[in-house]
Amino acid sequence: MIVHQQLPMSVNVASLDFLLIELVHTAKRLAEDRKKKSSSEKSIESDFQMLESIGFQVGRKITERLLLNRNRITETTDVMRFLCRELWPIVFRKPLDNLKTNRRGIFVLTDTYFYWFTKMTAMTGTEMAQITTPYFYFPSGFIRGVVYTFGYSAQVIAQCPNLPTCIFHVKFSPNPTQTSPGKPSTSESSQTDTSTRPANSQTPTTTRASSYTTLVSTSNQVSNEAEASAVETSANQAQNTEDATENEDRLPS
């Protein structure tokens, strides 16, 4: 009988990179084809949210695998440290560089050398937003999948201030999810999730991988700009009022 400890813990790095990047390219091609056929914006958006759903499942299953021989983590701060130090390197080759929190459910994760952006040519403004946006869906879904496994739901706001840096604002919902990890949300929990979703977000195709991701461009041409500003303001205020050693956790590269 095969036990979990005998399962392989890694795959070929090049194969994983090709797979993940090709997922993004496939979604972009599908979206472009729909756009040529004059499909609705909702149909085009669903192609990219497919990436978020895949990232959600990857994050959830990797977390479940690594938690087999660990004590249960319950605090949100410990969850985010576990994500930054142990889970992120599995998919993106290196730990996250910086983790900040206001101790009130808002975390700012910074990767100053995001692997997917390292080969991109330097660009700014609208051009950079158009190129980088599709690559945020998978990691944003990955973060939500990890958080979900620990019994929480969260909204993720992703942005690229400059290449190859990327920043993720993670805002935990006030009430933890009642659905046990690995099981689809019930109708009751689905209704709770809907109440925490931004007003302009679309209805997801699945309840357990519902979209909580907002993508922020450097030109601020986004429909959910107010929410992003609110999260950043809260994080900045907390950083100014609390001791830096309590609010900032610099992670080893």
UniProtKB/Swiss-Prot annotation:
- Record's GO cellular component, any one? TRAPPI protein complex
Presence of keyword S-adenosyl-L-methionine: no
Q: Polar residues bias: where?
A: 175-184, 215-242
Q: Name one GO biological process term.
A: intracellular protein transport
Q: Could you tell me which residues belong to the region Disordered?
A: 175-253
The Swiss-Prot or TrEMBL record describes its family as follows: Belongs to the TRAPP small subunits family. BET3 subfamily.
* PANTHER family in UniProt: GEO08327P1, TRAFFICKING PROTEIN PARTICLE COMPLEX SUBUNIT 6B
Protein name, entry field: Uncharacterized protein C13G6.05c
